[in-house]
Amino acid sequence: MDKRDLLDRLAANGDERLLLGRVWDKYEQCRRRNIPVVTGFLSPAEQELVRRLMGALDVREGWLLWGGYDTAQRRQAHFLPDWQTEPDFEAVAALRATFYEPNSLTHRDVLGSLMGLGVTRESVGDILVAEQSVDVLVTEPVRRFLLDSWDSAGRVRLKVQPIGPAELQVPEEKVKLLRDTVSSLRLDSVLSVGFSLSRSKAAEAVTSGKVQVNWADWQKPDRQVVQGDVLTLRGLGKCVLEEVGNQTKKGRVFITVKRYL
């Protein structure tokens, strides 16, 4: 398979092509040297690109995505040699920063302070903000750097210490299950259920470029979605087509959509 042609087919722009090229190089390094190789942290959209690349290469085993805990949003791609069956869990390190004033930091505050120290985005995984602490997933070299260098976020003073994966304070997901029937599994129909919109408003959101399916832009309201697809609507959040059920006597389809609050 010609590498250039495949990258051109999978990537929508230069940034995506560059990312896929780097990931492909990591995969080839693993196969050629038979050693574990890990990428930086990837956004959900970037993870979907990696899945498409691995699918195109027909690679179904020997790699996985991991971000430090089961429901992590940002994850690394781990490519495993033939002698390894699990990823190097230590490639994802964690630390906790505590502060005195409750609810005085946001995700943006924390990320901004890390970027201000010169930490790259791909070196940082999920940022889990609690009332008087924040847990941050990073690469091990960055954890060592932050333990020595990170003592504040804006005007908020921090006390930073390393923690293990079992100590992570993962916020409980707040979701709402929405059940309805649709005439078909068109994107605009499912979107209207997930975000309580009229069909016309849902279609307008799609055509105006506000909607992503599995973190890829999609502007065709009649696109068919399938169970498990993640739908994101700019400004309103995301939902998942959780279940596709049987048809009613009139031919409509029962669906369950999980809306993240």
Where are these regions (language model features)?
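Basic (Lys/Arg-enriched) interaction patch that binds polyanionic ligands
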Residues: 184-235
